Every structure is written in structure tokens, then in C-alpha cells.
């Protein structure tokens, strides 16, 4: 049996842009994607700390060092620039893998610059 487990998150990031006319997804600074081990086009959950909205989408790469967290498409109705969010990724793991899994937690400052990486 496989279990769906939390494996990584970018914690308390700040939304920098919301583009209603974009096709969809969330644009994330590539440095943050790398730190969290989230791939381009990977499914992510976004939990809005500011207003409580939650959604599923997929990750796109933004310029390195830009701090961009861009909410695209219809999701821009639910999240606005300045909102604080958690971006989380999950994966399927065997029982053995799940028991030793150490999720990555990427902490950022108010400008979405990497502060530290710590296990969950």
C-alpha cells in the first residue's frame, strides 16, 4: 500500500502578483522551488493564511532571486498581492518510505528570500 504524504512546503510566503488573465498555475522563484524540491508542473496546494482560501494548482518557474509568488488565472480571485500563503507538495510513498520521510520546510522572509531550510 502507498500513502500520500506531505513532503515539502514553502512556509509563510507573500503573494507578489495576481494575474487573472494568465492561463493558470502559480509562478514561484526558482530558488524557492529548488530549496523545496518542487518541480515545474508539479501539483501543489496553496493555503492562504490571510483569508483562509485553499486551492490546488501546479508550479511554474519564476526568475531566480526575484521572490516572485504569482497567483495566475482564476485563482487570482482568491489570493491577492500581500497575502501570506503556504505552498505545499505531497507524494506517494511506500509504507517503508513514509516512515522515514523527512519533509522539507522552506522558511522565507517578507520578500520571499530564503531564510533557512528545516525538517518538518
From Swiss-Prot:
It is found in: Cytoplasm. Substrate binds at residues 57, 73-75. Its cofactor is pyruvate. This is Aspartate 1-decarboxylase. It comes from Deinococcus deserti (strain DSM 17065 / CIP 109153 / LMG 22923 / VCD115). Binds 1 pyruvoyl group covalently per subunit. Is synthesized initially as an inactive proenzyme, which is activated by self-cleavage at a specific serine bond to produce a beta-subunit with a hydroxyl group at its C-terminus and an alpha-subunit with a pyruvoyl group at its N-terminus. GO terms for biological process: alanine biosynthetic process; pantothenate biosynthetic process. NCBIfam families: panD (TIGR00223). Keywords: Autocatalytic cleavage, Cytoplasm, Decarboxylase, Lyase, Pantothenate biosynthesis, Pyruvate, Schiff base, Zymogen. Catalyzes the pyruvoyl-dependent decarboxylation of aspartate to produce beta-alanine.
